[in-house]
Amino acid sequence: MRCVVYSIAKSSPLELVKIYQKQCRQFDCELELVDLFPKNTANAQKVSKKLAQKSYSLAFEPYLNPKAKNIALHPKAQRGDSFAFSKMLENHLNINFFIAGAYGFEENFLKDCQAWSLSEMTFSHEVAKIVLCEQIYRALSIIFKHPYHK
């Protein structure tokens, strides 16, 4: 299995994320983080919400894979517990997660993905990545009946 988290961000992986990446390997899952922040995104965010959203879509579109499960993290989307999250991931070999910038996704981009919400709360990119990586590891623990999730 391969899970890739694409985000509009400048930061590199945090230490805790590296721990979850290592733990996912025991389930034969390579957990990758790809931070994208093209030059046009910085300028677009200064101009308008619509232009910023368009720049996010342009950055992410090359990574949309019709053979993969594409999941966009969106605050108004479906949410569920860790078991529901694990069911959504189960039986997929390639999963792409997308975390937009401050202005969220364009509606057209969301049509190409399954939208999922981690919480009703707003998180910084760093916290969202940590929560997502932990939930991916927890989902794998549920799928493989590992004692991490009790």
From Swiss-Prot:
CDD domains: RlmH-like (cd18081). Homodimer. Specifically methylates the pseudouridine at position 1915 (m3Psi1915) in 23S rRNA. The keyword Methyltransferase applies. InterPro entries: Alpha/beta_knot_MTases (IPR029028), RlmH-like (IPR003742), tRNA_m1G_MTases_N (IPR029026). It catalyses: pseudouridine(1915) in 23S rRNA + S-adenosyl-L-methionine = N(3)-methylpseudouridine(1915) in 23S rRNA + S-adenosyl-L-homocysteine + H(+). GO terms for cellular component: cytoplasm. Pfam families: SPOUT_MTase. This is Ribosomal RNA large subunit methyltransferase H. It comes from Helicobacter pylori (strain ATCC 700392 / 26695). It is found in: Cytoplasm. Keywords: Cytoplasm, Methyltransferase, rRNA processing, S-adenosyl-L-methionine, Transferase. S-adenosyl-L-methionine binds at A100, L118, S119, E120, M121, T122, F123. One of its GO terms (molecular function) is rRNA (pseudouridine-N3-)-methyltransferase activity. Belongs to the RNA methyltransferase RlmH family. Its EC number is 2.1.1.177. Its main location: cytoplasm. The keyword rRNA processing applies.
